[in-house]
Amino acid sequence: MRASELLAPTLRETPAEAEIVSHQLLLRGGFIRKAAAGIYTYLPLGRRVLAKIEQIIREEMDRAGGQEVVLPIIQPAELWQESGRWEVYGEEMFRLQDRHRRQFCLGPTHEEIITALVRSEVTSYKQLPLLLYQIQNKYRDERRPRFGLLRGREFIMKDLYSFDLDQEGLNQSYRKMYQAYSNVFRRCGLDFRPVQADSGAIGGNYSHEFMALATAGEALLVYCRECDYAANVEIAVAKALPMIATENPAPLKEVATPGQKTVAEICTFLEVTPDRLIKTLFYEADGQLIAALVRGDRELNEVKLQNHLGCRHLLLADPERVRKATGAPVGFVGPVGLQGIPLYADLEIPYLVNGVAGANREGYHLVNVNPGRDFNPTAVVDIRQVEAGEPCPQCGAPLAQARGIEVGQVFQLGTKYSGALGANYTDARGQEHPIVMGCYGIGVSRTMAAIVEQCHDDQGIIWPLSVAPYQVVIIPASLKDDGQRQVAEGLYRELAAAGVEVVYDDRDERAGLKFVEADLIGYPLRITVGKRTITSGTVDVKWRSRKEETPLPLEGLSAQIQALLAREMEKYR
């Protein structure tokens, strides 16, 4: 490709809307352009990167036995109503009507439509197992689209669905996909961690997320450096860390704490440490008022609480409802003496001795609160957020914490959708059973952004060779020099004929500008044809990821470049 013919409109300045590195560089490098909030056009360079990522995905899905299909973006409401998710998705779902007033949606995901397909086409055990996948646009009406490709309203995903006879078959499919996903992200050049995860709105009983480590990541994960434990903090297992009792339980006592509502204020006023406080947080679980208890130095994990309760909706309770139920405003409520409100205590709460809690009377707290003596929780469960430095639940070593971008997730769905939509098979004895399903997604456009978040410097993007829009850029220092131009032209034609993806920067621009733009776009290998090419018969070759330049002779140059590329590509096999 000649640069004079390539649509790659670079920007000198960073657009004000771009908050994170990937958004900034993909805009500045001419890879994407904003069409509307959370909706982007992919320009030629961006489309080439996507195509490389998609090809890696296809190769790994096909190797695992997957078959590619294309499912409709517009989906009938009836299927979502059958599964019970039409209302669950709420305002995130784009809904529309046809001219006959029939309801449809723009697919945010494709469990219903793929299950309906298999329901009509698969009837016998002889047709299973089955792996079907697609690469397709998805749509979610995000309340606040941001971070470029990381949280958009239109995005590209790969979905694979497995259909098996039983749980053993699902386990095999899950292991296949887990390995295939590891292969995909390794080949894309990502530093990633598979972590245990919550299954969220898709549902199911077992799930892993594949996290690309990045400071811009919206997800928080903990992992162990000594063993293979890693988990999203939403479900990371917390060990109870008992406090060593240095005193005996003292009589319960009410003390005045006028105007002291926050943990910090109460600790200062009563001269106690935060780990002595019992935070009492009120929620509405599908409308029912409940209370959750954690230590004052801990954060409640709402995902864990919701999973334990098994409720569909979990919302912080309205303060006025709390006042009516307890007789006190938020900040002065506690577990002692509460009537008719279920209490869910974190694992650490029973170990407290002479703790502090609200007295359910405005302006007062209780001191010397002892669980078991002064109140009994409805249940004691793991509902707190895990923090860095805590012991690993598997080996006991200190946990590390990092931020990550979710680029993929795998789910064991079981019979959640096949049962709801009646996707059954008949076994060898003529008995009918629901098909056992798994779901496996990769955010293709998110993966592109995640690569940029990891692979960049102050000058621009540093694409891994496996996903770069072009592998090589040739820059003549001066097009006015006939010798340089002829060498550059000849090398360009020779490399292109050999199948190398090469850009020849033949634009009538300063060499300095071409170097700056080549670094911004992130071509992996740069070949500079300059004065030394004419005087000494060498060109300067430089990897974008390295500082040093290497002179190479013109004789046999094309073969040398191809050998360099082949060796580098071995990293991504």
Curated annotation (Swiss-Prot):
Q: Which GO terms describe its biological process?
A: prolyl-tRNA aminoacylation
Q: What is its EC number?
A: 6.1.1.15
Q: Where in the cell is it found?
A: Cytoplasm
Q: Where does it primarily localize? A: cytoplasm
Q: Which domain of life is it from?
A: Bacteria
Q: Which reaction does it catalyse?
A: tRNA(Pro) + L-proline + ATP = L-prolyl-tRNA(Pro) + AMP + diphosphate
Q: Which GO terms describe its molecular function?
A: aminoacyl-tRNA deacylase activity; ATP binding; catalytic activity, acting on a protein; proline-tRNA ligase activity; transferase activity
Pfam families xrefs: HGTP_anticodon, tRNA-synt_2b, tRNA_edit
Keyword line: Aminoacyl-tRNA synthetase, ATP-binding, Cytoplasm, Ligase, Nucleotide-binding, Protein biosynthesis
Q: Does the keyword Cytoplasm apply?
A: yes
Task: Tell me a GO cellular component.
Answer: cytosol
User: How does the annotation summarize its subunit structure?
Assistant: Homodimer.
What's this chain's function? Catalyzes the attachment of proline to tRNA(Pro) in a two-step reaction: proline is first activated by ATP to form Pro-AMP and then transferred to the acceptor end of tRNA(Pro). As ProRS can inadvertently accommodate and process non-cognate amino acids such as alanine and cysteine, to avoid such errors it has two additional distinct editing activities against alanine. One activity is designated as 'pretransfer' editing and involves the tRNA(Pro)-independent hydrolysis of activated Ala-AMP.
Q: What is known of its domains?
A: Consists of three domains: the N-terminal catalytic domain, the editing domain and the C-terminal anticodon-binding domain.
Q: Belongs to which family?
A: Belongs to the class-II aminoacyl-tRNA synthetase family. ProS type 1 subfamily.
Record's protein name: Proline--tRNA ligase
> What gene, per UniProt, encodes this protein?
proS
